[in-house]
Every structure is written in C-alpha cells, then in structure tokens.
C-alpha cells in the first residue's frame, strides 16, 4: 500500500519518501509524532465485535493509539459501549463511533490483503478463518 500511495501522491504533485521500519517501532514513531503518514495494518477482529479494536486503536490515551486520535465524544461513546450488553444498543453505539471516525478522518482504510493457505493432499481440514489467528487448529491433521 505504501508504494501505491506514493505513486498516487506523485500524480498530484506530492513527493512521498518511504521509510520501512520494523513493526515493533511503528506505534512509538506514531506516538512521538515522527511522521506525516503512517501505514500500518491490523487484521485481527477477535470476536466479530469491534470494541477491542476501536478502544485499543482509537480511544484517547490507549497504548496502541499510535495515531494520537482524540475525540471526547468518541471516548464517551466508548465508555458507554464498555458497559452496554444489549446487542441492539451496542450496534447503535458502534455505528455512531464509526461515523465519528469517518467524519474525523481518523483512519484511512486501504483494503484487506488477500490471504492464501496452501497445503498438499497429506493435510486435511486446513482452512482460513475470518480472523488472522488460529489458522493452525486442533482440526488440522494428517490426511492419512
């Protein structure tokens, strides 16, 4: 995505210098403000509920909030979400939080990379799950 962003920016007269860094230092660079644009990826949505992701990456003061995004209204909605258990009400809160993220341009979503899992006929039950963890499960076994 970085190279594509660089190429697109060049088309409109913006020079982009790319700096590849180890994933372990990205959040630190972001927290220190040592960037103009950080491209990082997060693939895991552990349970199909975005609360963990939204709070961790977008709530004010959270360690993983490397962007420095801060919006008191988002934080208040996040606090409400943390104590709300009714699925319909949680959905409403999440939608409102997502609208704030979009309106504030807090995050740019480039897409979702295609992932492939390849095995030969000696392996059975190898399948990709809807999150990036647990690809190797108790169900994967020798086909023999």
Predicted features by range, described:
Residues 1-6:
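Bilobed "Venus flytrap"/periplasmic-binding protein-like clamshell domains
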Residues 29-34, 55-83, 112-144:
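Short, solvent-exposed loop/beta-turn-alpha elements that line the ligand-binding surface or hinge
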